Amino acid sequence: MKQTVYTASPESQQIHVWSLNHDGSLKLVQVVDVPGQVQPMVVSPDKRYLYVGVRPEFRVLAYRIAPDDGALTFAAESALPGSPTHISTDHQGRFVFVGSYNAGNVSVTRLDDGLPAGVVDVVEGLEGCHSANISPDNRTLWVPALKQDRICLFTLSDDGKLVAQEPAEVTTVEGAGPRHMAFHPNQQYAYCVNELNSSVDVWELKDPHGNIECVQTLDMMPADFSDTRWAADIHITPDGRHLYACDRTASLITVFSVSEDGSVLTKEGFQPTETQPRGFNVDHSGKYLIAAGQKSHHIAVYAIAGEQGLLTEKGRYAVGQGPMWVVVNAY
């Protein structure tokens, strides 16, 4: 298995393309100059394209991925109805979802043979919309509205329309600020990192009665932490054994172990990392975590090891200015 790491640096308007070696080291393949401040990124399900959101002219750009080394070539673009904060796709590669924090909306862009072909739906009124996360069965879009302390639930129709479910939302505790999400590979549980109180909620997707329930909430910060809480990102290993979440004020990554059924998290430890970690990701082997420091202008690679999933730094690399997003492609 070959893997490529992509990092987005909006201040220098660059994407750095790295080859991830089996020992966890990175080799620079390409630096792409992007026509705008590049932030969110996602790889298409068929691994042929990288989709990126740019501002101040709000667009989604599609880059064709070279199958030999992961290098990028611009392929197409499409306008967006708001500044892109988060970008994702459905599992079939038919639609791109873009959440916009500033515009308070989520949009659906149709894909035509992998290329963006225009917006087909927009849902407004989602204050602080921070991500759009398709469920493992490709039917439900979970959309955290950070400023409203709720996660809105939409059914994805065949033509890309979003239809509010019943119930239409689940709510967090007041002031939590739901932000980003990850799903357990068993498709039974979802995890949401809350920005404003730096906690993680565990959501049971469907209980025996068809309800969605929060079954656990964990503080992700050290007991003696007293500064402003400012959580950012969350990811789970492919085997579902370890979960990670980061806080930007503390510049740390919290390590959780996950119970076999996915319902219970146990806080195992903390890893100091790059200054103001806005984004990170886990590779497809589950052996490495790559974190970006928005204020250090570096990325760091960590080895994931042991039953606890604790992190050991393997190396750090200079990237562009203000790196905010990390994605990993395997082929």
Swiss-Prot record:
Where is the chain membrane-spanning? none
Which SUPFAM superfamilies does this chain map to? Nitrous oxide reductase, N-terminal domain
Q: What is the lineage of its organism?
A: Bacteria, Pseudomonadati, Pseudomonadota, Gammaproteobacteria, Enterobacterales
Question: Pathway it belongs to?
Answer: Carbohydrate degradation; pentose phosphate pathway; D-ribulose 5-phosphate from D-glucose 6-phosphate (oxidative stage): step 2/3
Which enzyme class?
A: hydrolase
Q: Which domain of life is it from?
A: Bacteria
The name of this protein is 6-phosphogluconolactonase
Q: Which organism is it from?
A: Citrobacter koseri (strain ATCC BAA-895 / CDC 4225-83 / SGSC4696)
Q: What is its EC number?
A: 3.1.1.31
Q: Please provide the Gene Ontology terms (biological process) for this protein.
A: glucose metabolic process; pentose-phosphate shunt, oxidative branch
What is one GO cellular-component annotation here? cytosol
As for family, the record states: Belongs to the cycloisomerase 2 family.
Q: Keywords in alphabetical order, please.
A: Carbohydrate metabolism, Glucose metabolism, Hydrolase
Q: Which GO terms describe its molecular function?
A: 6-phosphogluconolactonase activity
List the residue ranges forming a coiled coil, or say none: none
UniProt keyword Ion transport present: no
Q: Which Pfam family, just one, is annotated for this protein? A: Lactonase
User: Which catalysed reactions does the entry list for this protein?
Assistant: 6-phospho-D-glucono-1,5-lactone + H2O = 6-phospho-D-gluconate + H(+)
Biological role stated in the UniProt entry = Catalyzes the hydrolysis of 6-phosphogluconolactone to 6-phosphogluconate.
